[in-house]
Design a protein with these regions (language model features):
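Extracellular attachment/recognition segments
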Residues: 191-281
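Beta-strand-rich ligand- or partner-binding modules
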Residues: 1-204, 208
Length: 281
């Protein structure tokens, strides 16, 4: 009996928009990037061409008051829109999200004398909010996919092939803004075991197809075929000198060939156990 080794869950992607260089390369709608703080925040709602007195404008980014809402969309790599698993799998997602509300006009560097400050910490912005959202498709993202609606990103398991992520910022007070300093997620696949019933090999190479495909990696996620399942064979009614060869292991199946001591093909019964990552289909 050749049994596969137990393995821990597989982290397929750890995405951090704030750790890219440059930071936050996703699609911004009514969102600005602040290079001084390395964060994103709601943009100003005013138009640059309507400014009549630049000296009277405290912040060009926030001119006209803070936008009521804005979105930042991202995917599986810097500047991309989609995380593509290459097939439909049940994927565990855990979000990474750090935000802070603030008054742009009440930043420390823009204040006067310390002795004149009534509140050293500044006013608390309570009329802002930030949400992290996700939507999923079971179609090929590079084709004409149909996605679910964006839903609240709660840590849990999502079934799909393509995943798109969004940070949504809102403010009900044009004087209050909110910034995102850390944004991303961790995607992982659980280890699982698939067992096959007693099967006759026939006198030749026997091809076995898994009930559910395993994730083995793609060119953009860990590398193609870098995480093949391990396959164990439990052979029955073997005679002295009999042996078997396992080949063509993939995410969808494998081939087993039983032979005798003369290297001739023989028919033997067997069961199998495959251990890998992700439940496809």
């Amino acid at each position: 009996i050749d049994l596969p080794d137990n393995q821990a869950p597989l982290t397929t992607q750890t995405r951090r928009e704030d750790l890219d260089s440059p930071k936050f390369q996703g699609t911004k709608t009514s969102i600005d990037f602040d290079s001084a703080t390395g964060t994103i925040n709601l943009a100003g709602s005013g138009l640059f061409d309507t400014i009549t007195d630049f000296d009277a404008v405290g912040s060009l980014d926030d001119f006209g008051g803070i936008a009521s809402s804005g979105t930042y969309d991202f995917g599986g790599a810097a500047g991309s829109t989609t995380l593509d698993l290459g097939g439909v799998f049940s994927l565990d997602l855990k979000r990474h999200f750090l935000t802070e509300g603030f008054y742009p006009s009440d930043l420390f560097d823009s204040r006067g004398l310390i002795d004149d400050m009534t509140d050293f910490d500044g006013a608390t912005a309570t009329e802002v909010n930030a949400e992290m959202l996700v939507r999923v498709t079971q179609d090929n993202p590079s084709g004409s996919p149909t996605y679910t609606d964006f839903q609240t990103f709660a840590n849990g398991t999502y079934k799909g092939r393509g995943f798109q992520f969004r940070a949504k910022l809102t403010s009900t007070d044009t004087a209050q803004d909110i910034k995102v300093s850390q944004l991303g997620y961790t995607a992982s696949l659980q280890r699982r075991t698939e067992q096959g019933n007693l099967t006759a090999s026939g006198a030749g190479a026997k091809t076995i197809t898994f009930t559910h495909p395993f994730f083995v990696g793609t060119s953009s996620l860990l590398g193609a075929n870098t995480n093949l399942p391990s396959v164990g064979i439990n052979a029955q009614n073997m005679a002295s000198g009999d042996f078997f060869e396992v080949s063509s292991i993939s995410g969808t199946g494998f081939t087993v060939h039983f032979k005798n001591s003369s290297n001739a093909s023989i028919d033997r019964n067997f069961t199998y156990q495959a251990v890998g990552f992700g439940k496809g289909g």
